[in-house]
Amino acid sequence: MSMAVDMSSKQPTKDFFSSPALSLSLAGIFRNASSGSTNPEEDFLGRRVVDDEDRTVEMSSENSGPTRSRSEEDLEGEDHDDEEEEEEDGAAGNKGTNKRKRKKYHRHTTDQIRHMEALFKETPHPDEKQRQQLSKQLGLAPRQVKFWFQNRRTQIKAIQERHENSLLKAELEKLREENKAMRESFSKANSSCPNCGGGPDDLHLENSKLKAELDKLRAALGRTPYPLQASCSDDQEHRLGSLDFYTGVFALEKSRIAEISNRATLELQKMATSGEPMWLRSVETGREILNYDEYLKEFPQAQASSFPGRKTIEASRDAGIVFMDAHKLAQSFMDVGQWKETFACLISKAATVDVIRQGEGPSRIDGAIQLMFGEMQLLTPVVPTREVYFVRSCRQLSPEKWAIVDVSVSVEDSNTEKEASLLKCRKLPSGCIIEDTSNGHSKVTWVEHLDVSASTVQPLFRSLVNTGLAFGARHWVATLQLHCERLVFFMATNVPTKDSLGVTTLAGRKSVLKMAQRMTQSFYRAIAASSYHQWTKITTKTGQDMRVSSRKNLHDPGEPTGVIVCASSSLWLPVSPALLFDFFRDEARRHEWDALSNGAHVQSIANLSKGQDRGNSVAIQTVKSREKSIWVLQDSSTNSYESVVVYAPVDINTTQLVLAGHDPSNIQILPSGFSIIPDGVESRPLVITSTQDDRNSQGGSLLTLALQTLINPSPAAKLNMESVESVTNLVSVTLHNIKRSLQIEDC
């Protein structure tokens, strides 16, 4: 039995992105350094002991009491006892039966245990030099020290397993209670309508009336009666104004929709694999640009399908390696819930409007076609969202290659002017080619091709939107890579100590990461221009433009109940995105800008890595003042396109329970934070960067700050101007502090 302790739990965590091919050792996935050879030894029980200095450290949930190990004298005593027993056995016939001598054990003193416990907390796997030094200090043999640490690690593992088992039992009991409650509710629902209380006869009568009205509408429109199967959950609801027109898609034969999808798949493959002259590389930016004349020569039907009056075509292509196998990745695109979660910063609403055709194979995705809706957003309220309806299909091109194809379908013989007025964004054949590489990795080649109507965009973001960077392929690929990387770190069971400081259990690590992810997704919903919120533009006394929205929380247990106000402001800063991101992450500089700290210094309690980049991390920080201590949960994320820093004050007692592995779902969090995006200008002079060499090679940053405040715990309370001014003043003070700290007050 090996004494090396891992952090694997009794039951692996189930995740829809889990892949058997994924390596759950972060060191094995992300670090290519060659590991040194290990020299296995055997302890006094004949077990193998590996003294590998570059091993990961076990996580324990608690410390046990004093332990004891067997000394050299014990071992020598055991050998001596064996000899005496042999002599006694040889003389058994003459002297009768003799009692076997008891083996001696050596109990360490309290002082010895205290010193070894102190070293164990710092280094559970001491090297030879540390063991020698400790043995001399405590008057013990090196083997005694070695065996004590070995036994201590075994105890820690047993404690951890018992703790995780208790958590699993509690979760099982909770699921049983929920199942029982659902069965009872279903039995009640079968006897009466949950909304009006009517019986089954009333429901059948109402259903017949609705069917009759639907048949009349179909007869008037001359449509074939294809069923409309919407799959919109509460968090995926969307405005159906433009759907009044788009239901004309169902007048098309399904074979016609399949034909359009097949043609779009061929076009996507061509767009993804072609080089020059279809794609040309920009000398100024280094990005690929679509040669539209060459595109129309290759696909002449694209000109005929274009809407009149549309003058903006956005086309981009990018590729990258993601940490997920191709099949799992394809499945996530065909599940609207997983798709929305994967691209939470880009998609505010999503729904499957209808399933045109079921797929084949075990997972039923190969050949699947479905009509979908999505509302795309940027993390700022000043850029309008884009609503788009499209047909998505999934094709397995080869055993190792999949294609996810999106295309908006136009209805023949329809009023194109009405269509253009309702649908301001259309997808020309777009999507991604996913190719399995090895060890759970995939290469994703993304093509984003949009036909959008001209819209008014604030000058601050105009360059970013007009160049196609805002909703382009680079943004989608970078977001996908970050999400898959986070999942790998979340599922990992063998985590180095430096990647999980301050959290000693695997269950605690996962609970903290879950709480941080929920906080960040809540921030995404709060900051964008989605129709979830109604933003009002105001101008502060200092002349700063600001957007303000308010909402009432009645039922969400994850947020405080009452009236919540969000104030947001966007501005350009002559600072590189990387430097600005590091500034907000640094707890040593938090007191320079955060009004919550009130000038007090901040210390980090825990820091969990969730990606290869050191900036992708979750931290719990404490702000100590004379009156009280405040804990702040901070989630930092960065990729090649954008960076986000989200934070929120959290209750100390409940957060301590989360650190111990408790469920964080119902902990109230009201997040604020920053979104940092490159300004779209590849080279701008006089920009502050982290190094002097990069001063003229990087652009500035588009910073969006959003602060949320609970102004009244009563949902019935009315919003007043004093409360709004207090929030907007806080935003103004924070922005002023940021400029002063970065020495750019003139901007």
UniProtKB/Swiss-Prot annotation:
Effect of deleting the gene: Defect in trichome development. Defect in accumulation of seed coat mucilage. Excessive root hair formation. High seed oil content phenotype.
Domain annotation START: ranges = 250-489
Enumerate the residue ranges of region (Disordered): 31-112
Q: What induces it?
A: Down-regulated by GEM.
Q: Where is the composition biased (Acidic residues)?
A: 73-90
- GO CC, alphabetical: nucleus
Compartments (UniProt record): Nucleus
Tissue-wise, where is it found? Expressed in individual developing trichome cells of the emerging leaf primordia. Expressed in differentiating hairless cells of root epidermis.
Instruction: Tell me the Pfam families matching this sequence.
Output: Homeodomain, START
What keywords are assigned to this protein?
A: Coiled coil, DNA-binding, Homeobox, Nucleus, Transcription, Transcription regulation
Compositional bias (Polar residues): 58-68
What residues are annotated to bind DNA?
101-160
Q: Which GO terms describe its molecular function?
A: DNA binding; DNA-binding transcription factor activity, RNA polymerase II-specific; lipid binding
Coiled coil regions in record: 155-223
The family database entries (SMART domains) matched by this protein are listed as: HOX (SM00389), START (SM00234)
Chief place where the protein resides: nucleus
Q: Which InterPro entries match?
A: GLABRA2/ANL2/PDF2/ATML1-like, HD, Homeobox_CS, Homeodomain-like_sf, START-like_dom_sf, START_lipid-bd_dom
PANTHER family xrefs: HOMEOBOX-LEUCINE ZIPPER PROTEIN GLABRA 2 (PTHR45654:SF24), HOMEOBOX-LEUCINE ZIPPER PROTEIN MERISTEM L1 (PTHR45654)
Assembly behavior: Interacts with GIR1 and GIR2.
Q: What does this protein do?
A: Transcription factor involved in the determination of epidermal cell identity. Required for correct morphological development and maturation of trichomes. Regulates the frequency of trichome initiation and determines trichome spacing. Acts as a negative factor for root hair development. Required for ectopic repression of root hair development in a subset of epidermal cells. May suppress hair formation in root epidermis by promoting differentiation into hairless epidermal cells.
Further comment found in the protein's record: The gain-of-function gl2-1D mutants (T-DNA tagging) exhibit reduced endogenous levels of anthocyanins.
Q: What is this protein called?
A: Homeobox-leucine zipper protein GLABRA 2
Q: Which organism is it from?
A: Arabidopsis thaliana
